[in-house]
Amino acid sequence: LWGTQLDFTGGLGNGFAYRFIYDKQEKDYWRNFGKVKNTTYAPSLSWENDKTKVLLSYEHKDILEPFDRGTNLLTATNALPDIPVSRRLDEPNNETTAKTDNIDFKIEHKLSDGWKLNAGYSYARYKYFYDQARITNVNVKTRTARREIEQQQGDQRVHSGTLNIVGEFGIGDIANRFVAGIDAMRNIRDLGPIYNKGITNSDINIDNPKYTSPVAAHKNGNGNAYQYNYLKTVGVYIQDTAYFTDNFIMTGGLRYEYFDQFAGRHCLNAANCKKGQNLTKTGNTDQHDGKLLYQLGAVYKFTPHIATFANYSESFRPQMSVATPVSGDLKPEQGKSFEIGAKYENSGFNATLALFNISKRNVAEAVGSGSNAQLNIVGKQRSRGVEFDLNGQITDSLSVAANYTYTKVKSLENELYPDAVNQQLSGVPKHQASLFLAYNVGEFDFGNIRVGGGARYLGSWHAYNSDYTKAYKLPHAVVYDAFIAYDTKISGKKVSFQLNGKNLTDKTYYPSTSGNATNTVSYTHLRAHETLMNL
């Protein structure tokens, strides 16, 4: 990998200042073909006086990366195909090209010594296009993989705005920080055209693949050539933080959230539209709802360095079906979370230990496949666990960053598939941990040198077939990384160089899966170095 980062900041006079960030990264993909390229331009302009601050920023990204779904789990044997993990069975033109644009405008105005007004607007757009040879079956006896040749593009735009007032005042001996506001969002997502039914039997030899970069025929026969999801939300909220003493703090809040949503799909054209499919925008999801949500928290400091905390919050998330019909009333997903913990912090060190419990109901799941696919409310899920984080200086030269997470997340109810009840959810390891050390070698005439390294642990986890009657275990892995960094000045400008070594032992590991009938397994086998220069 090679990359260049530039960051310029300066004043323009009369309260104005500017900043410009440029970042370019490029590397070869770790498997047998593919490139990863990312370029970012981010200018911003700010202005302020003694009462008002204004910030206008823009960010543009150009993205090119492989569209690699990994490999397919052979569900009959609970194994992966017996080929090198670096060998791809799709095509060199399996790439995603994308552009993102983000605009942010923020104003902060001081109304008085204790009150201020904040307002903001943001716009985000994400456009992408990809070609794909989707692997639908791997036959180890005939040594072939079957693919469907597909093509897709999409465009998503998000408008959001916020307005709030913040005040600090006292009620008797109790200091308060009060916030009240409103926010609104409009999310417009359009996918299509999607071509996925022209070439469905593109076979390739898994031992000696011949890549031809086929392009999808402009056909679609399953009524999902165009998919859309239009979501509007409005939230009104109040929150107060009360400082009863120097040691005891409580916060409480209310939020009312409302949404209106329309989503669905339709055919490519009349010639591709079959009976029962939509030729125009007739939604599978057309709903609106609202809910009052509660939040409560408390902090108690035993000493200036040791504190305990507790938090309770509720969530409300609209669901939608784009590509599949809806089974009955698609109720919004609702959740409740509770966290308690302890924290230690001083000028150079902090550590946090927390216990959490998250419960969700009205959990939706797509079941079936093809024309029989349907979105259903299947029941309840619960996540419980422990988190530990530690960061800080062991000595003046040696620092540490460590964390550990234990997560037990399972289905409590599943009306369609009772075998899913009490099973650890797919793709969620119970144990994850990391430990990294960094050492400042010291200042020299030519600059400063830092070195460091550590390990990441990803625990084993399971994937399931469509009715949860079979479980496939993915193994745990320990991955080692290291770096060396050099900081200096060139012509009075700070410059840093860093060499990163990732996965030093060349370990194959599996970060995720997708699907539940013929599981696609994303895996990593990357031993790489990265050279970065920051200005």
Where are the model-predicted features located?
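Membrane-embedded beta-barrel scaffold of Gram-negative outer-membrane proteins
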Residues: 106-132, 301, 308-309, 331-396, ...
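Single conserved hydrophobic/aromatic residue that forms the stacking wall/gate
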Residues: 525, 530-535
